[in-house]
């Protein structure tokens, strides 16, 4: 488990929602849903798992999540995200097929049926549901509460369901429109979560049955109430009108804005886009700028409708987005914008929490390091490393960490000027003297700690330069690597000793990052110098090829091999005369022949 995941786990909300696991490429490899995001996502990284789960966890390097209003919303969203992203760990479990809906037919005597096909103006549809089992469970519950007609064709006698109280036989039951309108309204309220009146009615019937000692009937009412509690289908994440729309929400805090966009296609929320950025003007103006860039830069599909928050001027949006702009005032559409806004707030708060934790973690590491070394808090650390290959193109590099963060504007590169051959001690002596004699002479900011890459010899050289040659009182430490070239020991003190540093401590991780960074910076610089030197030596003494033309060739082709592979026309295109190009090609050929000769 990496540091990013560790910190994100601490920030998960106790809310329902969906989580998306990602691999090192940023690809979504698994989508899941949870009643409690904190408990569910944390469970992946704690305790033991079966083989397939261990395999999944081994590939997770990051995750994100979407907060929903209910577990049902989370479940339906999970299905849509899986269908959209086809994560490799979900594909075997889910197939891409149409989803079941509940439908109240528009017949004279309406029926409640399950269908996978939607026809406009052919009845009322509720859903979609994740699978036929869920749809059937909801229908069974509705059948026990609302007596819809069960038979498709009229018959002249009551059916079996009538005797169970689950069918209103059209020959003897209510035939007036008011009855059916009221029944349909009750079902709509139930499926939209507004079931308090229904529950109260069932509770009254349960109490009445108990008073009449009809305990079996009372138990049936009790089970219905329990069934309603577990099968509510409050679907604000989904839209039943099959419309394509983008739903925008945003949140601002501490000079930052987070914009969250829900992409609804054919009535289903299939994906979301999250963008966090600093804003410098009025929040509403910057939001409008973002919308314009969103549809222009991303070549985004223009939906039939775009929902925007109430604070945004819809006329201005209409000027930059060529589609119908809606600012919902009430109902489900307004709740969808509110949900997008809520997720924007959650995402922005997570960013702040991660930053705060990172600051506290780094600050604590610096403070602890100072206490271990018995020095002042090393707010500014300067670290050095040499790089050469058998003494050729020797260079050194310095990186600077301020408050535990790289300060790249303060990085410095050094070409070794006075040392001949592979002598790391002499190279370190030269570089440190050049650096800190200038610090002393020009009154530059001195570090609180100097770190050299190396063992006892390197540290002693550094201390000799700093303390004896320059008379400075800057603490010097060394970072020793093991035989696997990994950070292993911190050397410090007089005499030098290995500082006891827990391998899993934040201070050790900080030192490891510093050593890796200075090594990377030194090696990168050495490659640049070596390539340039190789370039220069090969192209030296060619008439008509001065420093400017050499630099031009270096910037364009990067290597001698690339020049050798280029045509005369490609080289001449840089403005180099044909006679000079021929001389270059001849020189490269001669050098190649010399190297291949015995």
Swiss-Prot record:
<dbReference type="InterPro" id="IPR047296">
    <property type="entry name" value="GIY-YIG_UvrC_Cho"/>
</dbReference>
<dbReference type="InterPro" id="IPR035901">
    <property type="entry name" value="GIY-YIG_endonuc_sf"/>
</dbReference>
<dbReference type="Pfam" id="PF08459">
    <property type="entry name" value="UvrC_RNaseH_dom"/>
</dbReference>
<dbReference type="InterPro" id="IPR038476">
    <property type="entry name" value="UvrC_RNase_H_dom_sf"/>
</dbReference>
<keyword id="KW-0963">Cytoplasm</keyword>
<comment type="function">
    <text>The UvrABC repair system catalyzes the recognition and processing of DNA lesions. UvrC both incises the 5' and 3' sides of the lesion. The N-terminal half is responsible for the 3' incision and the C-terminal half is responsible for the 5' incision.</text>
</comment>
<dbReference type="InterPro" id="IPR004791">
    <property type="entry name" value="UvrC"/>
</dbReference>
<dbReference type="InterPro" id="IPR001943">
    <property type="entry name" value="UVR_dom"/>
</dbReference>
<protein>
    <recommendedName>
        <fullName>UvrABC system protein C</fullName>
    </recommendedName>
</protein>
<dbReference type="GO" id="GO:0009380">
    <property type="term" value="C:excinuclease repair complex"/>
</dbReference>
<dbReference type="InterPro" id="IPR010994">
    <property type="entry name" value="RuvA_2-like"/>
</dbReference>
<dbReference type="Pfam" id="PF22920">
    <property type="entry name" value="UvrC_RNaseH"/>
</dbReference>
<keyword id="KW-0742">SOS response</keyword>
<comment type="subunit">
    <text>Interacts with UvrB in an incision complex.</text>
</comment>
<feature type="domain" description="UVR">
    <location>
        <begin position="196"/>
        <end position="231"/>
    </location>
</feature>
<feature type="domain" description="GIY-YIG">
    <location>
        <begin position="14"/>
        <end position="91"/>
    </location>
</feature>
<dbReference type="Pfam" id="PF02151">
    <property type="entry name" value="UVR"/>
</dbReference>
<dbReference type="InterPro" id="IPR001162">
    <property type="entry name" value="UvrC_RNase_H_dom"/>
</dbReference>
<keyword id="KW-0234">DNA repair</keyword>
<dbReference type="InterPro" id="IPR000305">
    <property type="entry name" value="GIY-YIG_endonuc"/>
</dbReference>
<dbReference type="GO" id="GO:0006289">
    <property type="term" value="P:nucleotide-excision repair"/>
</dbReference>
<dbReference type="Pfam" id="PF01541">
    <property type="entry name" value="GIY-YIG"/>
</dbReference>
<keyword id="KW-0228">DNA excision</keyword>
<dbReference type="InterPro" id="IPR036876">
    <property type="entry name" value="UVR_dom_sf"/>
</dbReference>
<dbReference type="GO" id="GO:0009432">
    <property type="term" value="P:SOS response"/>
</dbReference>
<dbReference type="InterPro" id="IPR050066">
    <property type="entry name" value="UvrABC_protein_C"/>
</dbReference>
<dbReference type="GO" id="GO:0009381">
    <property type="term" value="F:excinuclease ABC activity"/>
</dbReference>
<dbReference type="GO" id="GO:0005737">
    <property type="term" value="C:cytoplasm"/>
</dbReference>
<dbReference type="GO" id="GO:0003677">
    <property type="term" value="F:DNA binding"/>
</dbReference>
<keyword id="KW-0227">DNA damage</keyword>
<dbReference type="Pfam" id="PF14520">
    <property type="entry name" value="HHH_5"/>
</dbReference>
<keyword id="KW-0267">Excision nuclease</keyword>
<comment type="similarity">
    <text>Belongs to the UvrC family.</text>
</comment>
